Design a protein with these regions (language model features):
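Ankyrin repeat (ANK) tandem alpha-helical domains that serve as protein-protein interaction scaffolds
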Residues: 1-209
Length: 209
């Protein structure tokens, strides 16, 4: 499309673009295509196919499709990673939470150029999901209570080192060990390592070689 001379742009129709999408053999090709085609060819169907096939294609969505309706359609097609590339002010908290909840906690979520979540996304459900995924840095400190950290270590045991001293207790450490004993064990404070603590470790079989 980049190489097509202007005098041949008349051949560019939705059907032509859809044919190109359906016959594309390059994973990144879906993203590149949406980047270069004229805005008038970025129809709902074209954009939907491109974004389903490559989550980063949402960077090139026209404004008319940067909304919950389009994002929910992506979720229905099991494309959840798009949230890494959208403008976060274009999505509501319920839809954002819905996408987050579908992503495997073992998968990393890369929020590009985002230092903190916008205020409208800081709902109880979103904060829980961010903790579950270990995305602590994007949540303001005021929202990080004991339950936030407990949720985080239950899914990401390696995050035990990020738990403030005031929240560090037996329950917190055991939860981290259950999630990832190998990573969590080195962050357990000496004051927690009592005979009663080790008894619980043995009972729960929370060992790591």
């Amino acid at each position: 499309f980049r190489l097509l001379p202007d005098e041949y742009h008349y051949i560019l129709t939705e059907d032509f673009v859809l044919h190109a999408l359906q016959n594309n053999r390059s994973y990144v090709g879906y993203c590149h295509l949406l980047e270069v085609i004229p805005d008038q060819l970025k129809t709902w169907k074209v954009c939907l196919i491109a974004c389903i096939m490559h989550f980063a294609a949402v960077k090139y969505l026209p404004k008319r499709f940067q909304n919950d309706t389009f994002y929910e359609e992506l979720i229905e097609h099991r494309q959840y990673d798009f949230i890494s590339y959208i403008k976060l002010d274009t999505i509501s908290a319920p839809v954002f939470e819905k996408a987050l909840s579908k992503i495997d906690v073992k998968s990393s979520i890369l929020f590009h150029d985002i230092k903190k979540l916008p205020k409208h996304l800081l709902t109880e459900g979103v904060i829980y999901e961010m903790a579950r995924h270990g995305e602590m840095n994007l949540i303001p400190t005021v929202y990080k209570d004991r339950n936030f950290y407990l949720t985080a270590v239950r899914y990401q045991g390696s995050d035990l080192d990020k738990v403030p001293e005031k929240y560090m207790d037996t329950e917190m450490c055991l939860a981290a060990l259950e999630s990832n004993a190998y990573a969590a064990q080195k962050y357990i404070p000496d004051r927690i390592k009592t005979s009663n603590f080790w008894k619980k470790v043995v009972e729960k079989r929370l060992f790591s070689s």
